[in-house]
Amino acid sequence: MYSEFRSIDGIILIDKPYGLSSHETLQKVKGILKIKKMGHTGTLDPLATGMLPMCCGRATKFSQFLMNFKKRYRVIAKLGQKTSTSDSEGQIIHVRPITFTNLQLQKVLKSFHGKIKQIPSMYSAIKYHGHALYKYARQGIVISRKVRDAIIYELKVLGYSYKHKYLELDIICSKGTYIRTLIEDVGEKLNCGAHVISLRRLQVGNYTSFQMIDIKTLNKLVKYNINVLEHILLSVDNAISCFPEVNIVPNVIKNLQNGQKVKTHSGFINQFVRITEGINRRFIGIGKINNINELYSYRLII
């Protein structure tokens, strides 16, 4: 049975289509690539499109680091209307006139820069007793949610129309930022209300939109020649390329595999490091350096 699966290691940046959940998108890609072990990093709502990094094979060991990267979004908000779901799928529950000036808009957006507090929407994918909150919301059940921290690094106006009542924003934020909640909070501060009508994730960490591939294109390419994956897949260690490198000699690898510490002179005290081996600098995993310059393994792929 398992002979049907391919052994593929690496990271692929999928352009998630509108209407599919992140899990549904993952299953489609797994079916196309015939990969048994695969996972996505960073959930996108069905209404959202854009970058959904997926880790294949041994790259799944490092997916947590992808989740920690900054995210970039382009969002279009409808002004003057608040909905039950904070997006265009919900019912309009409040309508107010738009009275703010451009100066007031800039002042409000500036107030969201830096660390902010958010209460996630009931229509989010946060799990409660094993089920997503939005499943409770659809049954009319309201669950108490804890306030969460987020960081907004940039919040820029790309377009604004008083006549058509829309606001387009470019947002760079930390992991765990709820864009629908952010837009709703901005709308409240503008005293008019707002909800999301379009949301696209353009960037995760240093991965840009130019590196994405959509499902249809991926399917065509793989059917034509499976070897094209070599040009699409990013290397296993790409997710942690920002970490400093510690190169070790081959004869101490067994020590790391057995949970032993290896003396180094790296100076990267209490930091994650990429461990490479030998003169070819073969990537073998992630480690940490303790306060007496000893390297110990965190995740190995050998």
Curated annotation (Swiss-Prot):
Organism superkingdom: Bacteria
UniProtKB keywords: Isomerase, tRNA processing
SUPFAM superfamilies cross-referenced by the UniProt entry: Pseudouridine synthase (SSF55120), PUA domain-like (SSF88697)
GO molecular function, one term: RNA binding
UniProt binding sites for substrate: H40, Y73, Y178, L199
Catalysed reactions, semicolon-separated: uridine(55) in tRNA = pseudouridine(55) in tRNA
Keyword Cell inner membrane: no
GO biological process: mRNA pseudouridine synthesis; tRNA pseudouridine synthesis
Active site: D45
Entry EC no(s): 5.4.99.25
Top-level EC class as recorded in UniProt: isomerase
NCBIfam families (alphabetical): TruB
Similarity comment: Belongs to the pseudouridine synthase TruB family. Type 1 subfamily.
Role this protein plays: Responsible for synthesis of pseudouridine from uracil-55 in the psi GC loop of transfer RNAs.
Official protein name in the record: tRNA pseudouridine synthase B
This protein's encoding gene: truB
